[in-house]
Amino acid sequence: MRRLGVSIYPEKSTVEEIKNYLEETSRLGFSRVFSCLLSVNKPAEEIKKEFTEINTFAHELGFEVIVDVSPRVFGELNISYKDLSFFKEIGADGIRLDAGFSGLEESIMTYNPENLIIEINMSNNVHTIDTIMDYRPNKYKLYGCHNFYPHRYSGLNL
């Protein structure tokens, strides 16, 4: 499955700038959006409003939306790994887990009733997937993806 994706950072750009960027990248054939909740420092309601607006617009353009999260995000927004409804409410098609879970949590999340994709960051530790598989996840909802965002030292060494 070959798809082109783009990264957006709502804490670094205005909603209007992001919408313009998504329109341009949509015209160029991109169909996947990677959005980041890791560095957002706003109240939950403000996050929900902003991300919902951006993600709704992205869906209108035909994008699939994946939101990057970590255990810290779950804690700060009071989200349980057994209840991922917050992410569905903001229009995410899936969440990308950077690190910090044991394997059991990721496995449980793959059975979420919101039908969200659970994507693992394969750039951190390729053995993470083995640990998750030990807990018998729903393999149809478990994806692996390497870093593709343009931050120095965020990709794999050659």
List the model feature ranges, each with a label.
Residues 12-13, 40-44, 71-77, 103, ...:
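Short, small-residue-enriched loops and turns at beta-alpha junctions
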Residues 101, 105-108, 114-158:
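Catalytic alpha/beta core domains of metabolic enzymes, predominantly
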